[in-house]
Amino acid sequence: MYGILVLEDGTIIRGDGFGAETEVLGELVFNTSMTGYVEILTDPSYKGQIVTMTYPLEGNYGVEKEWFESDGIKAEGFVVKDMTGSKLDEFLKEYNIPGISGVDTRYITRKIRSKGVIRSLLKTSTNPITKDEETELIKKVVEYPDISEIDLVPEVSTKETVIYNAEDEKTRCVLIDCGVKQSIIDCLVERGCSVVKVPYNSKEEEIMSYNPDFVLVSNGPGDPENMAETVETVKNLIGTLPVTGICLGHQLITIALGGKTYKLKFGHRGGNQPVKDIDSGKVYITSQNHGFATDDKIVPEGSELMHMNLNDDTVEGIRKIESNDLKNTVWSVQYHPEAGPGPHDARFLFDEMVELGIKFKAEKAN
């Protein structure tokens, strides 16, 4: 099958198509992970994006449902240097997602690094793609909106409340689902924390009706500035009970506290991002997937930076300055402590979430 990748600057990249025979538009990004293509493709945070893998070989260890981070592929398309085996091809076909192989992913990555993320179109076809078609495809890319103009969270958030009960419940969390990864839920449940997953646009009254001991605002796709409704809910919850966040959730908490976010040139996507804990000086290697960040020049009043990225000095964690009152506790991280895929250096943060919930539960009982 023929494959073609068309960039907004008119660049045409031809290769071998695999997966579904179709055409998609999206923001072209790169991921530096050496493994974990199943987790990456099924991560809801990739909604609206075509993912390029910098590691050259993909598909060599198959596909298993136990690795899924959601109910299916959420990325729009997949770009690899070499694709091996039939499982990855079948996987993309099952979810009607196109892929392209046999292309210079190093060239694509360097282009994104230099120019920034790029609007693009990926087309696969059993018929050769002509020069006349190329002109039409370029026009489609140029007319495609920037990802900041697309409201992506409603496409990946749960439509109804889902409860995950821990066998020996120690505490309960309401998770505001902006496109949560399954491994985040798993990390909480296995620590004795029952999780009530609610839609992104749930109001504080509904959230509090589940009697949570803390709230976690999840990861997800797109620009946090588009999510005024969720920000308002988070703002109303702060001071009522402990509030934590991961990735997009971190950005929403930043805005709720009075801070600002901005779009990164090419984002952080991969399992090898070094993060420094400002208090302890410890460095963690973390898994990340985000294209927006907290503006360190506008730290919300009453808050402080908690973690920083050692590659580019961007903000990786923020917290409300500690109070003796647990209900005022607020902290969030930009990276993914659950990994999925990636290192487990920061999974202790789930222990801290659960411990926070247990303490607040006891405080409520007194």
UniProtKB/Swiss-Prot annotation:
HAMAP family in the record:
CPSase_S_chain
Q: What does this protein do?
A: Small subunit of the glutamine-dependent carbamoyl phosphate synthetase (CPSase). CPSase catalyzes the formation of carbamoyl phosphate from the ammonia moiety of glutamine, carbonate, and phosphate donated by ATP, constituting the first step of 2 biosynthetic pathways, one leading to arginine and/or urea and the other to pyrimidine nucleotides. The small subunit (glutamine amidotransferase) binds and cleaves glutamine to supply the large subunit with the substrate ammonia.
Q: Where is this region: CPSase?
A: 1-168
GO molecular function term, any single one: ATP binding
The record, for PROSITE patterns, names: GATASE_TYPE_1
What organism is the protein native to? Methanococcus maripaludis (strain C5 / ATCC BAA-1333)
NCBIfam families reported for this sequence: CPSaseIIsmall, PRK12838.1
The protein, known as? Carbamoyl phosphate synthase small chain
Superkingdom field: Archaea
- In this protein, the active site sits at C247 (nucleophile), H336, E338
**Complex and partners:** Composed of two chains; the small (or glutamine) chain promotes the hydrolysis of glutamine to ammonia, which is used by the large (or ammonia) chain to synthesize carbamoyl phosphate. Tetramer of heterodimers (alpha,beta)4.
| Record EC number | 6.3.5.5
Glutamine amidotransferase type-1 domain location is 172-363
